[in-house]
């Protein structure tokens, strides 16, 4: 049973890696080509990529070594933030949140591998699988919301949804695997993600029109009516 959990979380880690690689390819093509080519760019490949990952064989038919495949260049890609020009300054925070979620997922795989004998009931295992399946669409949503033109409110909403899903996965994994001490790094990672999320939230609020001040013309008309 623990093999099913390990494979499920491993597939999730693979989806994160595939999403990052697809994001790099998309952004390079959108920002490094002439404007007329940008207008003709079709974002469908990334949707097909993630969709293909979601339609793989059943977890029971996969080995952990087959699903946890790391791109040899992925670490360099994640550490390099110079490949995209972002005048808004929000893209780096989105990437940071994706990095944190990616790291948490990889470490959850390792923890699950070491906690097979401590697993609780099959219901707990099912909870992990259900929550893990909810994360990949959230990753897809965040990646697609990073396409220009950027909408701060959309970025805020989708990164919040992703972080909530990952936090939920952490909770059910802790409960199912009896994880207790030595997990400060999880809370620290989530706190770091919250800091980046706060920047996106402030940008979303700043993008909303200021409704605190009344319209001068409307105010004068109201006074005349009185």
From Swiss-Prot:
Subcellular locations according to the entry: Endoplasmic reticulum membrane; Cell membrane; Secreted; Secreted, Extracellular exosome
Disulfide bonds: none
UniProt note on tissues of expression: Expressed in differentiated oligodendrocytes in early postanatal central nervous system tissues. Expressed by CD4(+) T cells, the expression increases upon activation (at protein level).
Membrane topology: Single-pass type II membrane protein
GO annotations of cellular component type: endoplasmic reticulum membrane; extracellular exosome; extracellular space; Golgi apparatus; plasma membrane
Primary subcellular site in the record, as a coarse category: endoplasmic reticulum
Record carries keyword Secreted: yes
Positions on the Extracellular side per record topology: 25-226
GO biological process, one term: negative regulation of protein localization to nucleus
Signal sequence annotation: none
Role according to the record: Functions as a negative regulator of MYRF in oligodendrocyte differentiation and myelination. Interacts with the C-terminal of MYRF inhibiting MYRF self-cleavage and N-fragment nuclear translocation. The secreted form promotes differentiation of T helper 1 cells (Th1).
Family: Belongs to the TMEM98 family.
Protein known as: Transmembrane protein 98
């Amino acid at each position: 049973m623990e093999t099913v959990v390990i494979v499920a979380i491993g597939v999730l880690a693979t989806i994160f890696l595939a999403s990052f690689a697809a994001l790099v390819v998309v952004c390079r093509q959108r920002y490094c080509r002439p404007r007329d080519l940008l207008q003709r760019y079709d974002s469908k490949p990334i949707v097909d990529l993630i969709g293909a990952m979601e339609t793989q064989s059943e977890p029971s038919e996969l080995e952990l070594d087959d699903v946890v495949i790391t791109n040899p260049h992925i670490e360099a890609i994640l550490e390099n933030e110079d490949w995209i020009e972002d005048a808004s300054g929000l893209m780096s925070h989105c990437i940071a949140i994706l990095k944190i979620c990616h790291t948490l997922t990889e470490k959850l795989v390792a923890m699950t591998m070491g906690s097979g004998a401590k697993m609780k009931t099959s219901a707990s295992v099912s909870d992990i699988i259900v929550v893990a399946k909810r994360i990949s669409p959230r990753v897809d949503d965040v990646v697609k919301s990073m396409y220009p033109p950027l909408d701060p409110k959309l970025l805020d909403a989708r990164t919040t949804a992703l972080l909530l899903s990952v936090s939920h996965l952490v909770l059910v994994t802790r409960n199912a695997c009896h994880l207790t001490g030595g997990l400060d790094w999880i809370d620290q990672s989530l706190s770091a993600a919250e800091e980046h999320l706060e920047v996106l939230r402030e940008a979303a609020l700043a993008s909303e029109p200021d409704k605190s001040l009344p319209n001068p013309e409307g105010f004068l008309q109201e006074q005349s009516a009185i």
